[in-house]
């Protein structure tokens, strides 16, 4: 629980404050506020969407604080990629021990990302998958919603610029994970 997390962090010497998000954009605004108050670390406790919002709140700052992650979402793709414990207190232990990993930050259409960049219907699937369905069937909910939206999907034109080079594609992708 949140009180247990805060107590554990405080016993380890951290001064803590917590903020519960209620709507899209809240985590970005709170991360920006934490920057103004010169926090040494900002901890994103939530799923990949919450993490993305926090990244967007701190990405443009030259002196970013450390970013702690407590994976609490449906998929926790980025946390899994970093081999973070999937239990809350295990993730808190990683933060307390000071384990850090440098990661690249990408930017697409004025939004930042650290895990993956998606566009077109893929992002729509993520946003339109009902929370209730995710709580019932977990990550499989995204596949259900994706197959439901498949007839509406069309190929997308994509241009990628990297190190002053550009590549253009037209794709319709159905993402799968082994």
Protein language model features and the residues they cover:
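Glycine-rich beta-strand-to-loop/alpha-helix junction loops that act as flexible
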Residues: 45-47, 72
């Amino acid at each position: 629980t949140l009180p247990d997390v805060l107590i554990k962090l405080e016993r380890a010497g951290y001064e803590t404050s917590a903020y519960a998000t209620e709507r899209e954009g809240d985590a970005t605004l709170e991360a920006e506020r934490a920057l103004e108050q010169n926090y040494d670390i900002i901890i994103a406790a939530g799923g990949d969407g919450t993490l993305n919002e926090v990244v967007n709140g701190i990405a443009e700052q030259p002196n970013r604080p450390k970013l702690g992650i407590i994976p609490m979402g449906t998929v926790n793709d980025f946390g899994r990629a970093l081999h973070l414990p999937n239990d809350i207190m295990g993730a808190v232990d990683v933060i307390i021990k000071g384990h850090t990993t440098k990661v690249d930050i990408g930017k697409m259409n004025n939004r930042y990302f650290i895990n993956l960049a998606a566009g077109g219907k893929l992002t729509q699937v993520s946003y339109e998958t009902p929370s209730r369905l995710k709580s019932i069937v977990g990550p499989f909910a995204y596949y259900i919603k994706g197959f439901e939206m498949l007839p509406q999907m069309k190929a997308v034109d994509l241009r990628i610029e990297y190190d002053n080079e550009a590549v253009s594609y037209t794709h319709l992708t159905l993402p799968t994970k082994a």
